[in-house]
């Protein structure tokens, strides 16, 4: 088991991949440059506000609303960094980058909650996760789609494209394509991207398996924005054991480098298991993430769903406190501005509620059914049903069972 590796001391994790190390390096924007960019972003926000509303009183109200929204999630914490990739500036993994085509529409969509925006299009969703295949070569300890893995596919390629089209008609800032392992349906992935409206960003959620340089190039050319690659330990053997696949760690390194080499934004995703959590382990993981040159690291708390169903995997208060303290140190302390930005949903969900559950996001499973999120499997209907709007309303009214849906 993975616990057997916890006592292993590693000062530095050597890279084991045989391909050349990428020359790509995400630019961490800090210091004076950060202040200049933040000032320019404020100018963009004002421009969007003026586009959305004619009444100057609404301009003031909208600006105050955005300030409250920021404080709601960040509190008084001061941002010390953002990431610049391909000339676009990213403050988070789940918001379009400033200077990207979808940024202004994303902001207008948030303003729509302050007061309905009647000038221009707004998005119904910030993020939608869409599992496009049941196929997977791994058997991960925490897999939330465990009961469906490697069963017969239900949706045809045409139906998959129809689902993407229907969601985009509602308006969505980002669509995250997952599985199973989506890279096992490479031609389907490319076809989905080629046929999609480029108004949305598309991300790949993957173990990294089969993200070769050729596949990374094909996906970039088809319109993929970035890849979220799962890595559950900085020790290769521990990750391989957790994933029940002897080459799992190797493919993580390959995937990150190949994605970086093709100008895809990269993120690592860590399941913060009870066995893993310690300041030492978290820091060793971030050192490796920095070495691999990813822009973001996502912390996902384990949930008792899928392969973890009926297991004591939820973090206790002491473990949560360790992760939260570490998250704040890396993200909001100037001394760690060279490290990737951490995305930690649990931190905000405990304080502000869940924005998924059909409100700002949802999960579409491999049958085309809608669920509150990948970790909350409560189907309310199918995207392709004529009655989809009512299914969506039922999803939103049900909200999230783990956190309040504000």
Task: Explain the meaning of each model-derived region.
Residues 135-145, 372-375, 402-405:
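Local cysteine-cluster metal-coordination motifs and their immediate loop/turn environment
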Residues 2-52, 232, 237, 241-357, ...:
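Radical SAM enzyme [4Fe-4S]-AdoMet core and its adjacent flexible, acidic
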Residues 187, 301, 374-375:
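Short clusters of small/polar residues that mark proteolytic maturation junctions
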Residues 369, 375-406:
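Membrane-interface junctions of multi-pass transporters
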Residues 126, 171-174, 198-202, 223-225, ...:
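Short, well-ordered coil/turn segments that N-cap beta-strands
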């Amino acid at each position: 088991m993975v616990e057997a590796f916890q006592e292993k001391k590693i000062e530095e994790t050597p890279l084991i991949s045989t391909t050349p190390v990428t020359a790509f390096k995400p630019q961490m924007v800090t210091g004076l440059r950060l202040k200049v960019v933040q000032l320019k972003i404020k100018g963009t926000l004002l421009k969007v506000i003026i586009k959305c509303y004619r009444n100057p009183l609404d301009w003031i109200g909208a600006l105050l609303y955005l300030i409250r929204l920021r404080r709601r999630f960040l509190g008084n914490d001061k941002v010390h960094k953002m990431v610049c990739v391909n000339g676009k500036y990213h403050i988070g993994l789940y918001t379009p980058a400033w200077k990207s085509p979808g940024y202004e529409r994303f902001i207008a969509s948030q303003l729509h909650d302050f007061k309905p925006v009647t000038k221009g299009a707004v998005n119904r969703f910030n993020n939608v996760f869409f599992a496009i295949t049941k196929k997977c070569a791994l058997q991960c300890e925490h897999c939330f789609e465990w009961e469906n893995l490697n069963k017969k596919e239900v949706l045809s390629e045409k139906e998959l494209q129809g689902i993407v089209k229907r969601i985009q008609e509602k308006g969505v800032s980002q669509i995250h394509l997952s599985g199973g392992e989506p890279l096992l349906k490479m031609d389907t992935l490319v076809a989905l991207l080629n046929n999609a409206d480029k108004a949305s960003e598309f991300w790949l959620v993957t173990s990294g398996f089969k993200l070769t340089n050729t596949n990374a190039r094909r996906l970039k050319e088809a319109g993929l924005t970035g890849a979220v690659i799962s890595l559950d330990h900085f020790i290769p053997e521990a990750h391989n054991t957790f994933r029940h696949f002897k080459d799992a760690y190797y493919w993580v390194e390959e995937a990150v480098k190949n994605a970086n080499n093709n100008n895809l934004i990269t993120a690592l995703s860590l399941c913060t298991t009870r066995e893993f959590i310690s300041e030492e382990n978290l820091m060793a993981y971030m050192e490796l993430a920095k070495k691999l040159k990813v822009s973001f690291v996502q912390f996902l708390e384990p949930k008792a769903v899928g392969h973890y169903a009926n297991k004591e995997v939820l973090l206790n208060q002491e473990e949560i406190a360790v992760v939260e303290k570490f998250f704040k140190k890396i993200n909001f302390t100037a001394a760690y501005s060279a490290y990737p930005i951490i995305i930690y949903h649990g931190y905000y969900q405990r304080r502000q509620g869940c924005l998924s559950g059909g409100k700002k996001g949802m999960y579409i499973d491999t049958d085309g059914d809608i669920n509150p999120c990948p970790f909350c499997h409560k189907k309310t209907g199918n995207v392709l049903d004529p009655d989809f709007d009512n299914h969506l309303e039922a999803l939103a009214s049900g909200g999230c069972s783990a956190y309040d849906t504000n």
